[in-house]
Amino acid sequence: MKWIFKQAQGRLKIIIICFMLYGLAILIRLFYVQIAQHEELTELAKANWDREIPFQEERGDITDRNGEAIVTNKLAPTLYFMRAQNDNVEEVADQLAPLLKTDREKLLEKLSRRAYLTKLAPEGKNITAEQAEQVQQLQIDGLYSGVDYVRHYPYGTLLSRLLGFTGYDSQGLAGIEYEYNDVLTGQGSAIRLFTDAKGNAMRQTPDEWRQGEGGATIELTVDVRLQQVVERELAQAMEKYSAEQALALAMNPKTGEILAISSYPTYDPTTYQKVEPSIYNRNLPVFMTYEPGSTFKIITLSAAIEEDVIDLENESFYDQGFTMVEGSRLRCWKRQGHGHQTFLEVVENSCNPGFIEMGHRIGSDKLLSYIHKFGFGEKTGSNLAGEASGILFSKEGFGPVESATTAFGQGVSVTPIQQVQAVAAAINGGTLYTPYIVSRMIGSNGQVLLENKPSAKRQVISEETSKKVREALESVVANGSGKHAYRDGLRVGGKTGTAQKVENGRYKDGDYIVSFIGFAPANDPEILVYVAVDSPQAQSVFGSTITAPIVGQIIEESASILGLPYSSDQLPKKYVWGDEVTEAMPDFIGQKGSEVMEQQYTYRIEWHGKGDKIIDQLPVAGKQIKQDEIIHLYLGN
Protein backbone atom coordinates (compact mmCIF):
# COMPACT_ATOMS: atom_id res chain seq x y z
CA MET A 1 0.00 0.00 0.00
CA LYS A 2 2.82 2.36 0.91
CA TRP A 3 4.51 1.45 -2.38
CA ILE A 4 1.38 2.39 -4.38
CA PHE A 5 1.14 5.75 -2.56
CA LYS A 6 4.77 6.58 -3.36
CA GLN A 7 4.24 5.63 -6.99
CA ALA A 8 1.19 7.93 -7.23
CA GLN A 9 3.07 10.74 -5.52
CA GLY A 10 5.91 10.44 -8.08
CA ARG A 11 3.50 10.59 -10.97
CA LEU A 12 1.81 13.65 -9.48
CA LYS A 13 5.15 15.44 -9.24
CA ILE A 14 5.83 14.66 -12.90
CA ILE A 15 2.42 16.04 -13.88
CA ILE A 16 2.97 19.18 -11.79
CA ILE A 17 6.41 19.72 -13.32
CA CYS A 18 4.95 19.26 -16.82
CA PHE A 19 2.24 21.83 -16.07
CA MET A 20 4.83 24.23 -14.71
CA LEU A 21 7.04 23.82 -17.78
CA TYR A 22 4.02 24.27 -20.05
CA GLY A 23 3.02 27.42 -18.17
CA LEU A 24 6.58 28.73 -18.36
CA ALA A 25 6.62 28.08 -22.11
CA ILE A 26 3.38 30.04 -22.48
CA LEU A 27 4.80 32.92 -20.44
CA ILE A 28 7.98 32.95 -22.56
CA ARG A 29 5.90 32.87 -25.75
CA LEU A 30 3.68 35.67 -24.49
CA PHE A 31 6.73 37.74 -23.62
CA TYR A 32 8.22 37.08 -27.07
CA VAL A 33 4.99 37.98 -28.86
CA GLN A 34 4.12 40.97 -26.67
CA ILE A 35 7.59 42.47 -26.42
CA ALA A 36 10.07 41.07 -28.96
CA GLN A 37 7.63 40.72 -31.87
CA HIS A 38 5.45 43.68 -30.97
CA GLU A 39 6.47 45.95 -33.85
CA GLU A 40 6.56 43.15 -36.43
CA LEU A 41 3.10 41.83 -35.54
CA THR A 42 1.68 45.34 -35.30
CA GLU A 43 2.86 46.00 -38.85
CA LEU A 44 1.33 42.70 -40.01
CA ALA A 45 -1.95 43.68 -38.42
CA LYS A 46 -1.80 47.14 -39.93
CA ALA A 47 -1.15 45.56 -43.32
CA ASN A 48 -4.62 44.05 -43.11
CA TRP A 49 -6.17 47.43 -42.31
CA ASP A 50 -4.06 49.93 -44.28
CA ARG A 51 -4.27 51.26 -47.81
CA GLU A 52 -1.46 53.36 -49.27
CA ILE A 53 -1.89 56.50 -51.37
CA PRO A 54 1.46 56.83 -53.17
CA PHE A 55 3.19 60.18 -53.47
CA GLN A 56 5.83 59.88 -56.18
CA GLU A 57 9.12 61.54 -55.33
CA GLU A 58 10.57 63.69 -58.06
CA ARG A 59 12.70 62.01 -60.69
CA GLY A 60 16.15 63.56 -60.84
CA ASP A 61 16.75 66.54 -63.12
CA ILE A 62 19.14 66.51 -66.06
CA THR A 63 21.16 69.72 -66.42
CA ASP A 64 23.85 71.11 -68.69
CA ARG A 65 27.39 71.90 -67.53
CA ASN A 66 26.26 75.27 -66.11
CA GLY A 67 23.38 73.83 -64.08
CA GLU A 68 20.71 74.85 -66.60
CA ALA A 69 17.80 72.38 -66.34
CA ILE A 70 17.13 70.63 -69.65
CA VAL A 71 14.90 67.92 -68.17
CA THR A 72 12.83 68.47 -65.05
CA ASN A 73 9.42 67.51 -63.61
CA LYS A 74 5.90 68.89 -63.67
CA LEU A 75 3.31 68.10 -60.97
CA ALA A 76 0.61 65.79 -62.36
CA PRO A 77 -1.53 64.13 -59.61
CA THR A 78 -3.24 60.74 -59.92
CA LEU A 79 -6.71 59.93 -58.51
CA TYR A 80 -7.62 56.96 -56.27
CA PHE A 81 -11.10 55.85 -55.16
CA MET A 82 -12.11 53.86 -52.05
CA ARG A 83 -15.53 52.34 -52.84
CA ALA A 84 -16.23 51.37 -49.22
CA GLN A 85 -16.32 55.05 -48.27
CA ASN A 86 -18.77 56.11 -50.98
CA ASP A 87 -21.49 53.88 -52.45
CA ASN A 88 -22.93 56.60 -54.67
CA VAL A 89 -20.70 55.72 -57.64
CA GLU A 90 -23.27 56.91 -60.21
CA GLU A 91 -23.07 60.46 -58.88
CA VAL A 92 -19.26 60.28 -58.65
CA ALA A 93 -19.10 59.20 -62.31
CA ASP A 94 -21.41 62.07 -63.30
CA GLN A 95 -19.13 64.56 -61.54
CA LEU A 96 -15.77 63.22 -62.70
CA ALA A 97 -16.38 62.13 -66.31
CA PRO A 98 -16.75 65.64 -67.82
CA LEU A 99 -13.92 67.00 -65.68
CA LEU A 100 -11.54 64.22 -66.79
CA LYS A 101 -12.90 64.33 -70.37
CA THR A 102 -13.49 60.59 -70.40
CA ASP A 103 -16.28 58.11 -71.12
CA ARG A 104 -18.72 57.97 -68.18
CA GLU A 105 -19.47 54.23 -68.49
CA LYS A 106 -15.80 53.22 -68.51
CA LEU A 107 -15.18 55.39 -65.48
CA LEU A 108 -18.26 53.98 -63.72
CA GLU A 109 -16.94 50.45 -64.25
CA LYS A 110 -13.72 51.35 -62.38
CA LEU A 111 -15.58 53.18 -59.60
CA SER A 112 -17.88 50.17 -59.07
CA ARG A 113 -15.09 47.71 -58.37
CA ARG A 114 -15.15 46.11 -54.92
CA ALA A 115 -11.42 46.61 -54.41
CA TYR A 116 -10.43 48.49 -51.26
CA LEU A 117 -8.57 51.09 -53.33
CA THR A 118 -8.86 51.63 -57.08
CA LYS A 119 -6.39 53.63 -59.15
CA LEU A 120 -8.38 55.61 -61.71
CA ALA A 121 -6.00 55.08 -64.61
CA PRO A 122 -5.59 56.14 -67.30
CA GLU A 123 -8.52 58.57 -66.90
CA GLY A 124 -7.34 60.07 -63.62
CA LYS A 125 -3.59 59.56 -64.01
CA ASN A 126 -1.33 62.60 -64.36
CA ILE A 127 -4.14 65.15 -64.38
CA THR A 128 -3.35 68.84 -64.75
CA ALA A 129 -3.02 71.24 -61.83
CA GLU A 130 -6.28 72.89 -62.93
CA GLN A 131 -8.12 69.54 -62.94
CA ALA A 132 -6.69 68.68 -59.50
CA GLU A 133 -8.03 71.96 -58.11
CA GLN A 134 -11.49 71.27 -59.58
CA VAL A 135 -11.48 67.76 -58.07
CA GLN A 136 -10.57 69.22 -54.69
CA GLN A 137 -13.53 71.60 -54.85
CA LEU A 138 -15.95 68.69 -55.46
CA GLN A 139 -15.20 67.23 -51.98
CA ILE A 140 -16.08 63.66 -53.05
CA ASP A 141 -15.97 61.11 -50.21
CA GLY A 142 -13.53 58.26 -50.86
CA LEU A 143 -11.70 60.13 -53.63
CA TYR A 144 -8.02 60.73 -52.96
CA SER A 145 -5.32 62.53 -54.92
CA GLY A 146 -1.80 61.09 -54.96
CA VAL A 147 1.20 63.23 -55.85
CA ASP A 148 2.64 62.27 -59.22
CA TYR A 149 4.93 63.86 -61.78
CA VAL A 150 5.51 63.85 -65.51
CA ARG A 151 8.74 64.78 -67.27
CA HIS A 152 9.07 68.34 -68.52
CA TYR A 153 11.47 69.31 -71.32
CA PRO A 154 11.76 73.12 -71.17
CA TYR A 155 13.79 73.23 -74.40
CA GLY A 156 11.38 71.03 -76.36
CA THR A 157 13.14 68.95 -79.00
CA LEU A 158 16.62 70.12 -78.00
CA LEU A 159 18.96 67.16 -77.35
CA SER A 160 16.02 64.77 -77.64
CA ARG A 161 17.94 61.94 -79.34
CA LEU A 162 20.45 62.03 -76.50
CA LEU A 163 18.05 62.54 -73.59
CA GLY A 164 15.37 60.05 -74.60
CA PHE A 165 12.07 59.94 -72.70
CA THR A 166 10.05 58.19 -69.98
CA GLY A 167 6.95 56.03 -70.34
CA TYR A 168 3.55 55.81 -68.69
CA ASP A 169 5.00 54.79 -65.32
CA SER A 170 7.85 57.35 -65.38
CA GLN A 171 10.43 54.69 -66.23
CA GLY A 172 13.15 55.66 -68.71
CA LEU A 173 12.62 54.08 -72.12
CA ALA A 174 15.34 55.66 -74.28
CA GLY A 175 18.53 57.71 -74.16
CA ILE A 176 19.96 59.09 -70.91
CA GLU A 177 16.55 58.56 -69.28
CA TYR A 178 16.93 54.82 -69.91
CA GLU A 179 20.68 54.39 -69.41
CA TYR A 180 20.62 56.11 -66.00
CA ASN A 181 17.08 55.18 -64.95
CA ASP A 182 18.18 53.70 -61.60
CA VAL A 183 20.07 56.89 -60.74
CA LEU A 184 17.26 59.23 -61.77
CA THR A 185 14.45 57.26 -60.08
CA GLY A 186 13.62 58.22 -56.52
CA GLN A 187 11.96 56.18 -53.76
CA GLY A 188 8.32 57.27 -53.43
CA SER A 189 6.57 58.57 -50.31
CA ALA A 190 3.08 57.46 -49.23
CA ILE A 191 0.19 58.12 -46.83
CA ARG A 192 -1.07 54.99 -45.03
CA LEU A 193 -4.82 55.08 -44.40
CA PHE A 194 -6.12 52.61 -41.78
CA THR A 195 -9.62 51.20 -42.36
CA ASP A 196 -11.76 48.34 -41.10
CA ALA A 197 -12.96 45.46 -43.27
CA LYS A 198 -15.70 47.70 -44.68
CA GLY A 199 -13.27 50.43 -45.60
CA ASN A 200 -14.32 52.81 -42.82
CA ALA A 201 -11.57 54.95 -41.31
CA MET A 202 -10.21 53.65 -37.96
CA ARG A 203 -10.24 56.84 -35.91
CA GLN A 204 -8.18 55.31 -33.10
CA THR A 205 -5.30 54.70 -35.53
CA PRO A 206 -3.90 57.91 -37.06
CA ASP A 207 -2.77 57.99 -40.68
CA GLU A 208 0.97 57.58 -41.24
CA TRP A 209 3.40 59.29 -43.61
CA ARG A 210 6.28 57.34 -45.16
CA GLN A 211 9.01 59.65 -46.44
CA GLY A 212 10.73 58.74 -49.70
CA GLU A 213 13.78 60.15 -51.44
CA GLY A 214 14.09 62.08 -54.70
CA GLY A 215 16.20 60.85 -57.60
CA ALA A 216 19.72 62.09 -58.29
CA THR A 217 20.45 64.96 -60.67
CA ILE A 218 22.65 64.18 -63.67
CA GLU A 219 24.86 67.04 -64.83
CA LEU A 220 25.99 66.69 -68.45
CA THR A 221 29.09 68.13 -70.10
CA VAL A 222 27.04 69.83 -72.83
CA ASP A 223 26.46 73.59 -72.96
CA VAL A 224 22.83 74.28 -73.81
CA ARG A 225 23.75 77.59 -75.48
CA LEU A 226 26.13 75.87 -77.88
CA GLN A 227 23.62 73.07 -78.38
CA GLN A 228 21.03 75.61 -79.53
CA VAL A 229 23.46 76.97 -82.12
CA VAL A 230 24.30 73.49 -83.39
CA GLU A 231 20.68 72.40 -83.70
CA ARG A 232 19.69 75.62 -85.46
CA GLU A 233 22.45 75.12 -88.04
CA LEU A 234 21.51 71.47 -88.63
CA ALA A 235 17.82 72.36 -89.02
CA GLN A 236 18.71 74.99 -91.62
CA ALA A 237 20.95 72.54 -93.49
CA MET A 238 18.22 69.89 -93.54
CA GLU A 239 15.77 72.37 -95.06
CA LYS A 240 18.21 74.02 -97.45
CA TYR A 241 19.60 70.80 -98.92
CA SER A 242 16.57 68.47 -98.47
CA ALA A 243 18.93 66.02 -96.75
CA GLU A 244 17.98 62.60 -95.38
CA GLN A 245 19.63 63.27 -92.03
CA ALA A 246 22.37 65.33 -90.42
CA LEU A 247 24.52 65.13 -87.31
CA ALA A 248 26.95 67.18 -85.29
CA LEU A 249 29.35 66.60 -82.42
CA ALA A 250 31.38 69.21 -80.55
CA MET A 251 34.06 68.26 -78.03
CA ASN A 252 36.79 69.79 -75.93
CA PRO A 253 39.85 68.10 -77.52
CA LYS A 254 41.91 68.55 -74.35
CA THR A 255 39.53 66.63 -72.08
CA GLY A 256 37.07 64.53 -74.10
CA GLU A 257 34.07 66.47 -72.73
CA ILE A 258 31.22 66.47 -75.25
CA LEU A 259 29.99 70.07 -75.54
CA ALA A 260 27.16 69.47 -78.02
CA ILE A 261 25.69 66.44 -79.78
CA SER A 262 22.83 66.44 -82.25
CA SER A 263 20.97 64.27 -84.76
CA TYR A 264 18.33 65.32 -87.30
CA PRO A 265 15.47 64.65 -87.80
CA THR A 266 14.58 65.22 -84.17
CA TYR A 267 11.38 64.71 -82.13
CA ASP A 268 9.41 65.91 -79.11
CA PRO A 269 10.05 63.56 -76.13
CA THR A 270 6.52 64.16 -74.80
CA THR A 271 4.97 62.80 -78.03
CA TYR A 272 7.51 60.13 -78.94
CA GLN A 273 4.70 57.80 -80.05
CA LYS A 274 4.25 59.94 -83.16
CA VAL A 275 7.68 59.14 -84.66
CA GLU A 276 9.36 56.00 -85.94
CA PRO A 277 11.49 54.10 -83.37
CA SER A 278 14.50 54.57 -85.67
CA ILE A 279 14.34 58.29 -84.84
CA TYR A 280 14.52 58.02 -81.06
CA ASN A 281 16.55 54.81 -80.88
CA ARG A 282 19.49 56.06 -82.94
CA ASN A 283 21.84 58.69 -81.62
CA LEU A 284 23.58 59.21 -84.97
CA PRO A 285 26.99 60.52 -83.76
CA VAL A 286 27.59 57.20 -81.97
CA PHE A 287 25.32 54.84 -83.94
CA MET A 288 25.93 55.71 -87.61
CA THR A 289 28.84 54.07 -89.46
CA TYR A 290 30.04 55.05 -92.92
CA GLU A 291 33.16 55.66 -94.98
CA PRO A 292 34.63 58.88 -93.61
CA GLY A 293 36.16 60.22 -96.80
CA SER A 294 38.79 62.94 -96.62
CA THR A 295 38.39 63.78 -92.92
CA PHE A 296 40.20 60.46 -92.36
CA LYS A 297 43.25 61.88 -94.16
CA ILE A 298 44.15 63.62 -90.89
CA ILE A 299 45.14 60.19 -89.54
CA THR A 300 47.35 59.45 -92.55
CA LEU A 301 48.91 62.92 -92.29
CA SER A 302 49.63 62.47 -88.57
CA ALA A 303 51.27 59.07 -89.13
CA ALA A 304 53.36 60.36 -92.05
CA ILE A 305 54.69 63.30 -90.03
CA GLU A 306 55.32 61.12 -86.95
CA GLU A 307 57.24 58.58 -89.06
CA ASP A 308 59.16 61.43 -90.75
CA VAL A 309 58.43 60.16 -94.27
CA ILE A 310 57.35 63.53 -95.71
CA ASP A 311 58.53 67.13 -95.60
CA LEU A 312 55.43 69.28 -95.83
CA GLU A 313 57.01 72.45 -97.22
CA ASN A 314 60.23 71.38 -98.94
CA GLU A 315 59.22 68.24 -100.81
CA SER A 316 57.30 68.13 -104.09
CA PHE A 317 54.72 65.65 -105.36
CA TYR A 318 53.23 65.48 -108.87
CA ASP A 319 49.55 64.58 -109.28
CA GLN A 320 48.43 63.58 -112.77
CA GLY A 321 44.85 62.92 -111.62
CA PHE A 322 45.28 59.26 -110.71
CA THR A 323 47.74 56.68 -109.47
CA MET A 324 48.05 52.97 -110.27
CA VAL A 325 48.16 50.39 -107.46
CA GLU A 326 48.47 46.74 -108.50
CA GLY A 327 46.57 47.37 -111.71
CA SER A 328 43.84 49.46 -110.07
CA ARG A 329 43.47 53.09 -111.16
CA LEU A 330 42.74 55.22 -108.08
CA ARG A 331 41.62 58.70 -109.09
CA CYS A 332 41.87 62.10 -107.50
CA TRP A 333 38.63 64.03 -107.01
CA LYS A 334 40.11 66.56 -109.47
CA ARG A 335 40.13 64.57 -112.70
CA GLN A 336 42.85 66.60 -114.42
CA GLY A 337 45.06 66.40 -111.35
CA HIS A 338 46.74 69.08 -109.27
CA GLY A 339 50.14 68.92 -110.99
CA HIS A 340 53.23 69.83 -108.97
CA GLN A 341 52.52 70.45 -105.27
CA THR A 342 54.33 70.50 -101.98
CA PHE A 343 52.95 68.01 -99.48
CA LEU A 344 51.41 70.94 -97.60
CA GLU A 345 49.49 71.74 -100.80
CA VAL A 346 48.54 68.06 -101.04
CA VAL A 347 46.83 68.52 -97.67
CA GLU A 348 45.28 71.87 -98.65
CA ASN A 349 43.92 70.41 -101.91
CA SER A 350 42.88 67.08 -100.32
CA CYS A 351 44.71 65.31 -103.15
CA ASN A 352 44.00 61.55 -103.11
CA PRO A 353 47.17 60.41 -104.97
CA GLY A 354 49.26 62.51 -102.57
CA PHE A 355 47.76 60.73 -99.56
CA ILE A 356 48.17 57.36 -101.27
CA GLU A 357 51.87 58.22 -101.55
CA MET A 358 51.97 59.08 -97.83
CA GLY A 359 50.34 55.74 -96.97
CA HIS A 360 52.82 53.88 -99.20
CA ARG A 361 55.77 55.52 -97.45
CA ILE A 362 54.35 54.73 -94.00
CA GLY A 363 53.79 51.08 -94.96
CA SER A 364 50.64 48.96 -94.67
CA ASP A 365 51.42 47.44 -91.27
CA LYS A 366 52.36 50.74 -89.64
CA LEU A 367 49.40 52.58 -91.17
CA LEU A 368 47.00 49.96 -89.82
CA SER A 369 48.74 50.13 -86.44
CA TYR A 370 48.26 53.93 -86.29
CA ILE A 371 44.59 53.55 -87.22
CA HIS A 372 44.11 51.23 -84.24
CA LYS A 373 46.14 53.51 -81.95
CA PHE A 374 43.84 56.39 -82.87
CA GLY A 375 40.92 54.32 -81.56
CA PHE A 376 39.26 53.04 -84.73
CA GLY A 377 37.76 49.56 -84.82
CA GLU A 378 36.57 49.69 -81.19
CA LYS A 379 34.03 51.61 -79.14
CA THR A 380 35.30 54.85 -77.66
CA GLY A 381 34.07 54.07 -74.13
CA SER A 382 31.71 57.05 -74.10
CA ASN A 383 29.00 54.90 -72.45
CA LEU A 384 26.45 56.37 -74.86
CA ALA A 385 23.74 53.87 -75.78
CA GLY A 386 23.91 52.25 -79.19
CA GLU A 387 27.56 53.04 -79.92
CA ALA A 388 28.98 51.05 -82.85
CA SER A 389 32.57 49.85 -83.34
CA GLY A 390 32.96 50.47 -87.06
CA ILE A 391 34.65 48.09 -89.51
CA LEU A 392 38.33 47.92 -90.45
CA PHE A 393 40.29 45.61 -92.72
CA SER A 394 41.95 42.67 -90.99
CA LYS A 395 45.73 42.57 -91.08
CA GLU A 396 45.57 39.64 -93.52
CA GLY A 397 43.16 41.49 -95.82
CA PHE A 398 45.04 44.79 -95.74
CA GLY A 399 46.88 44.59 -99.06
CA PRO A 400 48.36 47.39 -101.19
CA VAL A 401 45.01 48.44 -102.72
CA GLU A 402 43.22 48.39 -99.35
CA SER A 403 46.07 50.35 -97.79
CA ALA A 404 45.92 52.91 -100.61
CA THR A 405 42.16 53.50 -100.37
CA THR A 406 42.26 53.63 -96.58
CA ALA A 407 44.93 56.34 -96.76
CA PHE A 408 42.36 58.71 -98.29
CA GLY A 409 39.36 57.50 -96.24
CA GLN A 410 37.69 54.91 -98.44
CA GLY A 411 37.01 51.24 -97.67
CA VAL A 412 36.79 51.61 -93.89
CA SER A 413 33.67 52.23 -91.80
CA VAL A 414 33.81 54.50 -88.75
CA THR A 415 31.48 56.42 -86.43
CA PRO A 416 31.46 60.21 -86.03
CA ILE A 417 32.49 59.94 -82.37
CA GLN A 418 35.50 57.81 -83.37
CA GLN A 419 36.57 60.49 -85.84
CA VAL A 420 36.21 63.25 -83.26
CA GLN A 421 38.15 61.23 -80.67
CA ALA A 422 40.96 60.55 -83.17
CA VAL A 423 41.24 64.09 -84.55
CA ALA A 424 41.23 65.44 -80.99
CA ALA A 425 44.35 63.37 -80.34
CA ALA A 426 45.93 64.60 -83.58
CA ILE A 427 45.56 68.27 -82.57
CA ASN A 428 45.75 68.31 -78.74
CA GLY A 429 49.38 67.29 -78.40
CA GLY A 430 48.93 63.64 -79.31
CA THR A 431 46.88 62.22 -76.40
CA LEU A 432 43.83 60.01 -77.02
CA TYR A 433 41.06 60.86 -74.53
CA THR A 434 37.84 58.96 -73.83
CA PRO A 435 34.82 61.07 -74.84
CA TYR A 436 32.28 61.48 -72.04
CA ILE A 437 28.92 63.22 -71.56
CA VAL A 438 28.08 62.77 -67.85
CA SER A 439 29.97 65.23 -65.69
CA ARG A 440 28.47 64.57 -62.24
CA MET A 441 25.68 62.78 -60.40
CA ILE A 442 24.31 64.69 -57.41
CA GLY A 443 22.02 63.12 -54.79
CA SER A 444 18.80 64.78 -53.62
CA ASN A 445 20.66 65.77 -50.44
CA GLY A 446 23.29 67.65 -52.46
CA GLN A 447 25.99 65.01 -52.04
CA VAL A 448 28.11 64.36 -55.14
CA LEU A 449 27.68 60.66 -55.89
CA LEU A 450 29.98 60.52 -58.93
CA GLU A 451 32.27 62.95 -60.71
CA ASN A 452 33.89 62.07 -64.03
CA LYS A 453 37.31 63.42 -64.94
CA PRO A 454 39.22 63.41 -68.25
CA SER A 455 40.60 59.95 -68.98
CA ALA A 456 43.70 59.68 -71.17
CA LYS A 457 44.06 56.34 -72.97
CA ARG A 458 47.49 56.68 -74.55
CA GLN A 459 49.94 58.95 -76.35
CA VAL A 460 49.54 58.36 -80.09
CA ILE A 461 51.85 60.97 -81.63
CA SER A 462 54.35 63.49 -80.27
CA GLU A 463 53.54 67.10 -79.35
CA GLU A 464 55.82 68.26 -82.17
CA THR A 465 53.91 66.18 -84.73
CA SER A 466 50.60 67.45 -83.35
CA LYS A 467 51.77 71.06 -83.77
CA LYS A 468 52.62 70.42 -87.43
CA VAL A 469 49.21 68.78 -87.99
CA ARG A 470 47.46 71.84 -86.51
CA GLU A 471 49.45 74.19 -88.71
CA ALA A 472 48.71 72.15 -91.84
CA LEU A 473 44.98 72.05 -91.06
CA GLU A 474 44.91 75.79 -90.37
CA SER A 475 46.43 76.22 -93.83
CA VAL A 476 43.61 74.06 -95.27
CA VAL A 477 41.10 76.63 -93.99
CA ALA A 478 43.11 79.69 -95.02
CA ASN A 479 44.35 78.47 -98.41
CA GLY A 480 42.62 75.25 -99.35
CA SER A 481 39.37 73.30 -99.45
CA GLY A 482 38.21 74.50 -96.02
CA LYS A 483 38.12 78.22 -96.82
CA HIS A 484 34.36 78.50 -96.15
CA ALA A 485 35.10 77.82 -92.48
CA TYR A 486 37.51 80.78 -92.29
CA ARG A 487 36.63 83.45 -89.73
CA ASP A 488 38.49 86.75 -89.38
CA GLY A 489 40.12 87.03 -85.98
CA LEU A 490 39.62 83.36 -85.13
CA ARG A 491 42.33 80.86 -85.95
CA VAL A 492 40.37 77.95 -87.41
CA GLY A 493 41.79 74.66 -88.67
CA GLY A 494 39.95 71.81 -90.30
CA LYS A 495 39.44 69.25 -93.05
CA THR A 496 36.68 68.54 -95.53
CA GLY A 497 35.15 65.15 -96.27
CA THR A 498 33.04 63.87 -99.17
CA ALA A 499 32.24 60.15 -99.11
CA GLN A 500 30.25 58.21 -101.68
CA LYS A 501 27.53 56.12 -100.02
CA VAL A 502 27.58 52.33 -100.28
CA GLU A 503 24.49 50.18 -100.88
CA ASN A 504 24.57 46.39 -101.22
CA GLY A 505 28.36 46.46 -101.56
CA ARG A 506 28.36 49.02 -104.39
CA TYR A 507 28.93 52.77 -104.47
CA LYS A 508 25.80 54.78 -105.30
CA ASP A 509 26.22 57.31 -108.08
CA GLY A 510 25.52 60.87 -107.00
CA ASP A 511 24.75 59.98 -103.37
CA TYR A 512 27.17 61.32 -100.77
CA ILE A 513 27.74 62.04 -97.10
CA VAL A 514 29.54 65.38 -96.87
CA SER A 515 31.37 66.43 -93.73
CA PHE A 516 33.77 68.88 -92.17
CA ILE A 517 35.75 68.71 -88.96
CA GLY A 518 37.10 71.99 -87.61
CA PHE A 519 38.72 73.36 -84.46
CA ALA A 520 39.70 76.64 -82.83
CA PRO A 521 41.90 78.31 -81.86
CA ALA A 522 44.23 76.49 -84.25
CA ASN A 523 47.30 77.12 -82.10
CA ASP A 524 45.64 75.93 -78.85
CA PRO A 525 42.34 74.14 -79.59
CA GLU A 526 39.49 74.43 -77.09
CA ILE A 527 36.67 73.21 -79.32
CA LEU A 528 36.47 70.58 -82.06
CA VAL A 529 33.32 70.43 -84.22
CA TYR A 530 32.27 67.69 -86.65
CA VAL A 531 29.24 68.06 -88.93
CA ALA A 532 27.97 65.56 -91.52
CA VAL A 533 25.01 65.91 -93.90
CA ASP A 534 23.59 62.76 -95.48
CA SER A 535 22.43 62.88 -99.13
CA PRO A 536 22.23 66.66 -99.61
CA GLN A 537 20.53 67.85 -102.80
CA ALA A 538 22.69 70.55 -104.35
CA GLN A 539 24.58 71.40 -107.53
CA SER A 540 27.92 71.24 -105.73
CA VAL A 541 27.94 68.32 -103.28
CA PHE A 542 31.18 68.73 -101.34
CA GLY A 543 32.09 69.11 -97.70
CA SER A 544 33.88 72.30 -98.67
CA THR A 545 30.68 73.99 -99.87
CA ILE A 546 28.01 72.48 -97.58
CA THR A 547 29.44 71.58 -94.17
CA ALA A 548 32.51 73.83 -93.91
CA PRO A 549 30.35 76.99 -93.65
CA ILE A 550 28.20 75.31 -90.98
CA VAL A 551 31.20 74.41 -88.83
CA GLY A 552 32.63 77.90 -89.35
CA GLN A 553 29.40 79.46 -88.08
CA ILE A 554 29.23 77.14 -85.06
CA ILE A 555 32.84 77.93 -84.13
CA GLU A 556 32.23 81.66 -84.61
CA GLU A 557 29.27 81.66 -82.22
CA SER A 558 31.05 79.37 -79.77
CA ALA A 559 33.73 82.05 -79.35
CA SER A 560 31.48 84.22 -77.17
CA ILE A 561 29.92 81.21 -75.41
CA LEU A 562 33.20 79.54 -74.47
CA GLY A 563 35.35 82.67 -74.35
CA LEU A 564 37.66 81.71 -77.22
CA PRO A 565 40.45 84.24 -77.77
CA TYR A 566 40.59 86.27 -80.97
CA SER A 567 43.96 86.64 -82.67
CA SER A 568 45.59 89.10 -85.04
CA ASP A 569 48.30 86.69 -86.21
CA GLN A 570 46.14 84.14 -88.03
CA LEU A 571 47.03 83.02 -91.54
CA PRO A 572 45.56 85.44 -94.10
CA LYS A 573 42.84 83.96 -96.28
CA LYS A 574 43.73 83.24 -99.89
CA TYR A 575 40.91 84.72 -101.93
CA VAL A 576 40.04 83.42 -105.37
CA TRP A 577 37.64 84.76 -107.97
CA GLY A 578 34.05 84.42 -106.81
CA ASP A 579 34.78 84.48 -103.07
CA GLU A 580 32.77 86.94 -101.00
CA VAL A 581 35.03 89.29 -99.06
CA THR A 582 33.91 89.59 -95.44
CA GLU A 583 35.17 91.21 -92.28
CA ALA A 584 34.40 90.94 -88.59
CA MET A 585 31.69 93.22 -87.19
CA PRO A 586 33.35 95.76 -84.85
CA ASP A 587 32.20 96.31 -81.28
CA PHE A 588 30.49 99.73 -81.42
CA ILE A 589 28.75 99.53 -78.03
CA GLY A 590 29.81 102.39 -75.75
CA GLN A 591 31.19 104.55 -78.56
CA LYS A 592 29.80 108.00 -79.35
CA GLY A 593 27.43 107.99 -82.29
CA SER A 594 28.85 111.25 -83.66
CA GLU A 595 32.37 109.81 -83.83
CA VAL A 596 31.22 106.64 -85.61
CA MET A 597 29.30 108.74 -88.16
CA GLU A 598 32.51 110.55 -89.14
CA GLN A 599 34.26 107.31 -90.19
CA GLN A 600 34.00 105.51 -93.53
CA TYR A 601 33.08 101.83 -93.69
CA THR A 602 32.67 99.17 -96.37
CA TYR A 603 29.17 98.48 -95.05
CA ARG A 604 26.08 100.65 -94.60
CA ILE A 605 24.85 101.79 -91.19
CA GLU A 606 21.18 102.16 -90.26
CA TRP A 607 20.64 104.22 -87.12
CA HIS A 608 17.88 103.69 -84.53
CA GLY A 609 16.79 105.64 -81.46
CA LYS A 610 18.11 108.86 -79.95
CA GLY A 611 21.00 109.59 -77.64
CA ASP A 612 24.73 110.20 -77.43
CA LYS A 613 26.08 106.67 -77.19
CA ILE A 614 25.60 103.37 -78.98
CA ILE A 615 23.83 100.97 -76.60
CA ASP A 616 23.23 98.00 -78.90
CA GLN A 617 24.09 96.66 -82.34
CA LEU A 618 23.14 94.02 -84.91
CA PRO A 619 24.95 91.87 -85.90
CA VAL A 620 26.89 91.22 -82.71
CA ALA A 621 30.58 92.02 -82.53
CA GLY A 622 32.80 89.47 -84.28
CA LYS A 623 30.17 88.18 -86.71
CA GLN A 624 31.29 88.12 -90.35
CA ILE A 625 29.64 90.77 -92.53
CA LYS A 626 29.84 91.32 -96.27
CA GLN A 627 30.80 94.46 -98.11
CA ASP A 628 27.84 96.81 -98.58
CA GLU A 629 25.80 94.89 -95.96
CA ILE A 630 23.41 96.90 -93.76
CA ILE A 631 24.21 96.92 -90.03
CA HIS A 632 22.01 98.37 -87.26
CA LEU A 633 23.25 100.65 -84.46
CA TYR A 634 20.99 101.72 -81.57
CA LEU A 635 21.47 105.03 -79.74
CA GLY A 636 20.59 105.82 -76.13
CA ASN A 637 21.74 107.78 -73.09
Predicted regions and their residues:
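BRCT (BRCA1 C-terminal) domain core and associated BRCT-interaction motifs
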Residues: 605-625
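Periplasmic/cell-envelope proteins involved in peptidoglycan metabolism and beta-lactam response
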Residues: 1-273, 365-377, 386, 485-488, ...
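Conserved SxxK-family serine transpeptidase/carboxypeptidase catalytic domain
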Residues: 124-138, 144-161, 165, 216-217, ...
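Soluble non-cytosolic domains of exported or imported proteins
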Residues: 57, 86-91, 122-129, 170-174, ...
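Conserved "repeat-terminator" motif of extracellular CCP/Sushi domains
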Residues: 625-637
